[in-house]
């Protein structure tokens, strides 16, 4: 199942990379500088997509095998949001992505690198299934002894029959992006594994009038202010 999925979903970007690279190496006088830039950008985007896929594959393998040692420490949610937004891919520029925190001093106990990977996966997922120039919002607020973090988009939402299976490994919605790429169904499964390792839960709900809200919890850090 894994090998079948990998061979199917790596073929499209690899074919695109090799085809575009071949065109660039040919000395075609009709190939304008603008077209060369477009082909170079396409190669970069395909390579970046492959890199994300391999990162998710390696990460979820380590999580499933218990090979990840969590480096838990208190982190400011605002700092985590800022870091994630600063390292988003080129595709993110076509969307309006905002981040809001209910309390500037809101903190949670986490492995920052892993939680940032969760947020990047959720944001990339929202980018994948929403039209260009749509809005994606990150929001965090205290909820008892936890912090609830939400990634909300204004796309088509999640079919009712898919919500319970969405975080299963290799499950996809069956939708293919306009560029022919289709995920392996690892990103959300990895998110669930990481959140569960932190003692939290993750789920998804549809929002009115349309869109989806992916929510997960982390243990809240108690902040004591001294006069």
Residue positions per predicted region:
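Short alpha-helical segment of the dimerization/phosphotransfer core of two-component systems
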Residues: 45-50
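Short alpha-helical Gxxx[C/S/T] motif in the catalytic ATP-binding
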Residues: 187, 191
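Short conserved segment of the HATPase_c
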Residues: 146, 158-172
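Conserved catalytic submotifs in the C-terminal HATPase_c
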Residues: 71-76, 96-106, 143
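Short helix-loop "hinge" at the ATP-lid/N-box region of the Bergerat-fold HATPase_c
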Residues: 126-127
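Conserved micro-motifs of the catalytic ATP-binding
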Residues: 65-70, 107-110
């Amino acid at each position: 199942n894994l090998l079948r999925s990998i061979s199917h979903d790596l073929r499209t970007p690899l074919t695109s990379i090799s085809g575009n690279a071949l065109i660039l190496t040919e000395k075609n006088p009709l190939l304008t500088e603008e077209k060369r830039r477009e082909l170079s950008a396409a190669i970069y985007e395909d390579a970046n997509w492959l890199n994300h896929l391999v990162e998710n594959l390696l990460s979820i393998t380590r999580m499933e095998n218990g090979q990840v040692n969590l480096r838990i420490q208190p982190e400011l949610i605002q700092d985590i949001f800022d870091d994630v937004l600063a390292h988003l891919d080129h595709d993110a520029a076509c969307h309006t992505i905002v981040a809001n925190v209910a309390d500037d001093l809101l903190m949670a106990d986490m492995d920052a690198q892993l939680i940032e990977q969760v947020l990047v996966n959720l944001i990339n997922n929202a980018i994948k299934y929403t039209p260009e120039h749509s809005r994606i919002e990150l929001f965090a607020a205290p909820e008892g002894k936890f912090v609830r973090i939400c990634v909300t988009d204004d796309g088509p939402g999640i079919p009712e029959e898919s919500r319970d299976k969405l975080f299963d490994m290799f499950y996809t919605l069956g939708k293919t992006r306009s560029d022919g790429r289709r995920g392996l169904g690892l990103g959300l499964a990895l998110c669930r594994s990481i959140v569960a390792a932190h003692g939290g839960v993750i789920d998804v709900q549809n929002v009115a009038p349309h869109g989806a809200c992916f929510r997960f919890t982390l243990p809240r850090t108690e902040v004591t202010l001294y006069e």
